[in-house]
Regions:
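PDZ-domain C-terminal substructure recognizer with occasional recognition of PDZ-binding tails
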Residues: 26, 30, 79-80, 94-130
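PDZ/PDZ-like peptide-tail recognition elements
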Residues: 26-62, 98, 121
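Conserved PDZ fold ligand-binding element
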Residues: 67-90
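N-terminal cap/lid segment of alpha/beta-hydrolase-fold proteins
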Residues: 124-157
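Short, surface-exposed "cap/lid" segments of acyl-processing enzymes
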Residues: 157-159, 163-190
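Alpha/beta-hydrolase active-site loop
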Residues: 217-238
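Accessory cap/linker subdomain of secreted extracellular hydrolases
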Residues: 271-362
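Short beta-strand/loop motif that positions the catalytic acidic residue
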Residues: 363, 369-371
Length: 448
């Protein structure tokens, strides 16, 4: 069995926690959550993360941040947060993010193998600012909880087309994305500069949102979709939004969730980037085959990998067995579950139950499907199949654009293999593929 965990739809595993300060357009009753000003990742990015053999380690201490003020240093190994062991870098980042500004936390570390305990007073997450738009912080209510909503409003008068961003797999905040030079940042920034209203709805328990944690069993795909539906309905009420020209930009697993959204709340069109057209079960088998072959496994071993994965996926997606039970079936099954970035069983199983053909049969809207040829997390065939599905029910409504050299994260790579093994050369630059921004803007402008 190979040591490569399947690369699925997670955009970024290790993200710097912001420390920049700034003003904001407006906010509401949701309290501001905290940041610590650290970038944390496994000690060795080339190896699987493990709290004993490859623990979460501070890579960067941001100037002016709470971590710097408390005396934390690059190279410190994170052992525990408030007496609870730190299992992964993502675990640490998530637990910090659930604290409010002004909270104190105690972090146990190893510094050059010597144990230390450091108390950190957390700072508020900065509000976004823009010279091109007013940033509106508000919320929507869902099942007795509130989801943080971030809206950019053009400074020009009149009604403007709107775009809701739906991100991919995982638990993360989109607050601060506007100025991020990678990921969704350049796309959101370009929309803002071109006088689109943009909206981001945080997932449950992420950013300033309250409600169940994103990893909680109650955090289902259907619940996530209802948050986006509530966001769309709010967006259409603003006097600076043209409610007849509201779009969705969805990435990776996002278009699957979007297929649940558009059957509940109409939109004018959708951009689906780096996604799939078949069921998650079928996709996952081909994903293992594709990536095992990419890293050079003999084809008899590739076949064995796929067969083993089929057993794991059958138990999880077809028989709906709990993730913990499936993980016990073997290391490959455990790897499959880990690749879902902590998402609860029911969330992933609801994704697995989706028939995209059934969903898109009910939604007659224009759709642009984008695929970058250096993305090994999906394939051109998956994207073309999604286009075929949509056009079979609604002729001419879906179109396909292929971008040479673009990876799953919208950056440029020489090949799918380079994307798959990118963490072996963490300092190698991969410039953002600006062509994806141009393609999205062109299509949106043609449809309003």
């Amino acid at each position: 069995m190979n040591n490569l965990r399947p690369c699925v739809f997670a955009l970024s595993l290790y993200t710097a926690i912001s420390t920049t300060s700034g003003a904001f357009g407006q906010t509401n009753e949701l309290p501001r959550h905290a940041v610590i000003g650290l970038q944390v990742a496994p000690a060795n990015l080339d190896k699987p993360e493990d709290p004993v053999t490859n623990p979460a380690t501070i890579k960067v201490v941001a100037a002016g941040g709470a971590g710097e003020a408390a005396g934390l240093q690059a190279g410190d190994v994170l052992v525990a947060l408030d007496d609870m062991p730190v299992t992964t870098a993502g675990d640490f980042a998530h637990r910090i993010s659930r604290h409010l500004a002004g909270d104190s936390v105690t972090i146990r570390i190893l510094r050059q193998r010597a144990p230390m305990s450091i108390t950190v007073m957390l700072k508020p997450r900065p509000y976004e600012t823009s010279s091109d738009a007013e940033i509106v912080y508000t919320s929507v209510s869902l099942n007795g909880a509130y989801r943080r909503v971030i809206i950019t409003r053009p400074k020009t008068s009149g009604r403007h087309p709107g775009v809701l961003l739906i991100g991919g797999l995982g638990c993360y905040s989109l607050d601060g994305e506007l100025t991020r030079p990678a990921g969704y940042g350049p796309i959101v920034s370009a929309l803002v500069k071109n006088a689109f209203v943009t909206m981001r709805v945080e997932k449950t328990g992420e950013g300033d949102s309250n409600g169940p944690a994103c990893t909680d069993p109650k955090a289902t795909a259907e619940l996530e979709a209802r948050g986006y539906v509530a966001g769309l309905r709010l967006l259409k009420t603003y006097d600076f939004v043209d409610p007849t020209h509201v779009f969705i930009f969805a990435h990776s697993l996002g278009p699957l969730v979007a297929s649940l959204v558009v059957t509940q709340e109409p939109v004018h069109g959708l951009v689906a980037a780096e996604t799939i057209g078949r069921s998650w079960y079928e996709y996952s088998l081909e994903n293992v085959r594709r990536q095992s072959a990419l890293i050079g496994e003999p084809f008899d071993q590739v076949d064995a990998e796929v067969r083993a994965h089929a057993i794991c996926a059958s138990h999880f997606f077809l028989q709906h067995e709990p993730a913990d039970d499936v993980s016990k079936l073997g290391e490959q099954c455990a790897d499959m579950i880990r690749s879902y970035a902590g998402m609860p069983s029911l969330y992933m199983q609801q994704i697995g139950d989706l028939s995209l053909a059934k969903q898109w049969k009910s939604a007659d809207i224009p759709v642009l499907v984008i695929y970058g040829t250096s993305d090994p997390a999906t394939s051109a065939d998956e994207s073309r199949y999604l286009v075929e599905i949509i056009n079979s029910f609604h002729p001419g409504r879906a179109s396909y654009v292929e971008l040479p050299g673009m990876g799953h994260d919208f950056a440029r790579y020489d090949s799918q293999l380079e994307f798959l093994t990118r963490r072996k050369e963490p300092n190698k630059p991969h410039p953002y593929d600006d062509e994806v921004v141009a393609v999205v803007l062109k299509w949106l402008n043609e449809h309003f």
